[in-house]
């Protein structure tokens, strides 16, 4: 078994022992099993899911995954279980980021608002994908 912890600045969002975990690494989705080699990797907004069950995953923002043979610690700005994503909230974040991006002057401002918009868009898409009641 593999222990997985997902941690945000607000605290621990998930802690459980699983057989496998899939994470949204920058180079693509990464599947991790017990006895994985040591690795520290950057993650991007996407879905973390366990034991090949993507319906019960957790949407995460930017962060890092610290992988050891028996543990995965995901440190991320934001993490929300798929069923708890507030679609309206993330639509507002997306709209605000789009407005702010058009007014951004510095490379730092552009990068900040691009990241916020990408994370909001990813959370919106995850919510729509896993909730058939939500229309695109």
Curated annotation (Swiss-Prot):
Taxonomic superkingdom: Bacteria
- Where is this protein found? Cell inner membrane
Report the GO terms under cellular component: plasma membrane; proton-transporting ATP synthase complex
Membrane-topology annotation of the record: Peripheral membrane protein
List the GO molecular function terms.
ATP binding; proton-transporting ATP synthase activity, rotational mechanism
Q: What InterPro entries does the database record attribute to this sequence?
A: ATP_synth_F1_dsu/esu, ATP_synth_F1_dsu/esu_N, ATPsynth_dsu/esu_N
Q: What keywords appear on the UniProt entry? A: ATP synthesis, Cell inner membrane, Cell membrane, CF(1), Hydrogen ion transport, Ion transport, Membrane, Transport
> Where is this protein primarily located?
membrane
Recorded hits in NCBIfam families, A to Z, give: ATP_synt_epsi
Quaternary data: F-type ATPases have 2 components, CF(1) - the catalytic core - and CF(0) - the membrane proton channel. CF(1) has five subunits: alpha(3), beta(3), gamma(1), delta(1), epsilon(1). CF(0) has three main subunits: a, b and c.
What does the similarity note say?
Belongs to the ATPase epsilon chain family.
Q: Quote the HAMAP family the UniProt record gives.
A: ATP_synth_epsil_bac (MF_00530)
Q: What is this protein called?
A: ATP synthase epsilon chain
Organism annotation:
Hydrogenobaculum sp. (strain Y04AAS1)
């Amino acid at each position: 078994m593999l222990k997985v912890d997902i941690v945000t600045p607000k605290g621990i969002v998930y802690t459980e022992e699983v057989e496998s975990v899939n994470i949204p690494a920058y180079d693509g989705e990464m599947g991790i099993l017990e006895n994985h080699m040591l690795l520290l990797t950057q993650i991007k907004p996407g879905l973390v899911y366990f034991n090949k069950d993507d319906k019960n995953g957790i949407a995460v923002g930017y962060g890092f995954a610290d992988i050891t043979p028996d543990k995965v610690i995901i440190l991320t700005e934001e993490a929300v279980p798929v069923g708890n994503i507030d679609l309206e909230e993330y639509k507002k974040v997306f709209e605000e980021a789009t407005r702010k991006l058009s007014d951004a002057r510095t490379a730092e401002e552009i990068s900040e608002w691009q990241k916020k918009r990408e994370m909001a868009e990813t959370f919106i898409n995850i919510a729509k994908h896993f909730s058939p009641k939500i229309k695109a």
